[in-house]
Amino acid sequence: MPSLMVGGTTSSAGKSLLAAAFCRILARRGYDVAPFKAQNMSLNSFVTSKGKEIAIAQAYQAFAAGIEPDERMNPVLLKPKGNFVSQLVVMGEAVGDVDSRKYYGVKVEWLKRVVEEAYLSLAEEYDFVVIEGAGGMAEINLYERDLPNIHIARFARPDILIVGDIDRGGVFASLYGTYALLPDDVKPLVKGFVINRLRGREDVLESGIRELERLTGIRVLGVLPYLDYNFPSEDSLNIEEWGAEGTVGIVRLPRVSNFTDFEPLREHARFLSLNSSLNGCEVVIIPGSKDTIADLKALKSSKLGEEIVRKAGEIPVIGICGGYQIMCRELVDMGVEHGRIRAKGLGLLDAVTEFREYRKRTVQVEKRVNGNAVILDRIRGEKVWGYEIHKGITRASNPIFEDDGCASEDGMCWGTYLHGLFWNENVLRALGGYLGIKFRQKEDWADLIADEVEGRLDLGVLGL
């Protein structure tokens, strides 16, 4: 069973996007293909139909391949919590918090077996597995415990592409250095380099490409332009790449989580700092939070929070998960996160959220739009899918789905626990209709990136 690995010189070099493109290309050529990333560190997760958590990137690579995401595609997920601590998710199930300084010494041998079994299971079921590496491949201090790069390369023996980001500068040194530092048993697997995110003329790279090929004996398969096709990001780094304009304003909470909920809106959205204003915004969204009560306090004491409350009723205010909780009348913590406290919410919704036990609800759901919520009223009676990852229970009047959400009397303020809401094509159409604009659909970006990669890379070197 053939496999292809997309490794990189750094984090955010374009590995996730390129892996998704190969999933789409192979699927369009008739292969049954699955994505795989042995270990991912991501603030943003996706819940499968079985209620298993995986990194958001692997979920959308699966969609690009035309298949349902499952936990084998990302057997090890680390969700950073701060101070060297991450939540460890193994085969879709949270198994506890780990300190990174102890993680590599205690857990790695067990996790190697988990990774190998997950990969073999996919390899038996699919014609092709597209493997994504993590960070830079040449982390020489981690080679013996580098699950997503060196370990899986040695185990699966895939053809490897190394992608470098020219937009950051130093791409030739990065590609050469990464290849030069690879272990001797991994170097023969490298079949090509890819230069990503070129904003200028390709011909100015020709002499550098020739010299890189001479020094390494490895072909540069092609150069990709700067592609901005709403591929979900794994961490907050990519928020900085969003524009400063847009009619959809997304509140940048200090502890924001699952901001990939809003990637489909990216062309017409911007993040709002707490000291900014709503000028130019026709819709405001309060996103999820890793610490709802702390972010509530920060928002309430800010200029932006005051303006949101003041303008509620004039423009739609939407809350997703933690943002929904923030919009409630009251939040009650029974000792789960901050001790026993009661906090007044923004008061935009007639609802109360209670945190009674440290239990997180993780499930994928499909719901029918029933309530009177601006924008969603355009698709009343239709179904939407999403996933819930939250602590706390909200008691509300005027729900917008059968058993979830709440809307204000005029429908201008509403909230829901559904992550992934804006990845629904009908919701995107409804929002676009309200704003008088058109958003790019999920299927569009998958084909667009596949077309770019097919048209610009010499895939014959890979036998494709």
Swiss-Prot record:
Its UniProt pathway annotation is: Cofactor biosynthesis; adenosylcobalamin biosynthesis
Q: State one molecular function term (GO).
A: ABC-type vitamin B12 transporter activity
Q: Domain named GATase cobBQ-type: which ranges?
A: 245-427
SUPFAM superfamilies the UniProt entry points to? Class I glutamine amidotransferase-like (SSF52317), P-loop containing nucleoside triphosphate hydrolases (SSF52540)
Domain of life of the organism encoding this protein: Archaea
InterPro entries noted in UniProt: Class_I_gatase-like, CobQ/CobB/MinD/ParA_Nub-bd_dom, CobQ_GATase1, CobQ_N, CobQ_synth, GATase_3, P-loop_NTPase
* Active-site residues, as the UniProt record annotates them: C321, H419
Q: Which cysteines are joined by disulfide bonds?
A: none
CDD domains associated with the record: CobQ_N, GATase1_CobQ
Among NCBIfam families, the record links this protein to: cobQ, PRK00784.1
As for what it does, the entry says: Catalyzes amidations at positions B, D, E, and G on adenosylcobyrinic A,C-diamide. NH(2) groups are provided by glutamine, and one molecule of ATP is hydrogenolyzed for each amidation.
Q: Which family does it belong to?
A: Belongs to the CobB/CobQ family. CobQ subfamily.
Write down what this protein is called.
Probable cobyric acid synthase
Q: Where is the organism placed in the taxonomic lineage, from the top?
A: Archaea, Methanobacteriati, Methanobacteriota, Archaeoglobi, Archaeoglobales
Q: What is the gene called?
A: cobQ
